[in-house]
Amino acid sequence: MNTHALPNARRQPVTFVSGEGCYLTDEAGRRYLDLVSGLGVNALGYNHPRIIAAITGQARRLVHTSALYGNEFQEPLARLLCQMSGLDRALFVNSGAEATEAALKLVRHFAGDRRRIVALEGSFHGRTRGGMAVTGQPALRDPFAPYSLPVSFVAPNDEAQLRAAFSPEVAAFLFEPILGEGGVRPLEISYMQLARELCTRHGALLVADECQTGLGRTGKIFGFEWAGVQPDIVTVAKPLAGGLPLGAVLFSAAVAEHFPLTSHGSTFAGGPLACRVALEFLDEMQRLLPHIAEVGEALAAELAPYGPVRGRGLMRAVPLEIPGDPIVAAARDAGLLINCTQKTVLRFLPPYILSADQVREAGGILKRAFSR
């Protein structure tokens, strides 16, 4: 039993020691097909040659310098992320939660006396203080109340509620294009378009949390692209640096004008090792976009017998009428790693390199898991 390292999640009864492609291997040498990919982080699978070469090559040269100095990879990475997102500036951080914190600071500086955030019921934006304030899940949020930040929560895809929530004191609308921890619930195209329209009309900022949906997961680089809208601020993290800690906040020049130097900083963020790996990941991710869309449809078809499939690309879920944990356990015992969120929703976040044969392999294991 682990007596010193405090778990921050309900641990599965397995310890992994290595990985290759879409498979993990445990201490006993047993292999598992992984459709969780480190909660969406290991998007290129395990031991990917480009990622390994970048890590080992850069580790021999320079790992860390701190925010006091530049490095040869930070500006090219910032430029590429800005080009991809349609935005102008990038601020590097260590995680999705820290990206939320920095985004909230950007909103505060831009909006001045207007402080209210409109966010979504069921949303998740990290476990830091600011992230909890805008997370629309009472079980996670309430234990740390009260919060100084005023937040109005609205039901996803309820356009009437969204319209009613806007007032002169609203500074921003914060959304996930697909609510990840909230059950993999996609926002409707018209809803995201209305959010953009309302923010523009009221002078508020549109803030897209793309930590789970972004960087290829849905079959497009960003989830907001499905609606053809342009956010003012975008947060990214999870797969950005191939398993190394790195996130970023992307924002417009208009927002940048209101953000003083040193308003947010991080000792480790944007270092040469993580930034070099991120450049390799983004190049490979763009090449894989057609494959993500194609194999995502194959995965959805394989999941269809078990319930109405939700999501896009390789971010999929099946809501059940029974608890999901027993299915997760049965699948794991049979060599397949999946995830359950919101107690009854099976979630699938496989590596982008998942093959059609592996989709069929997963389907066969799931069939056995459901028959137990």
What are these regions (language model features)?
Residues 1-372:
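Conserved N-terminal phosphate-binding loop of PLP-dependent enzymes in the Aspartate aminotransferase
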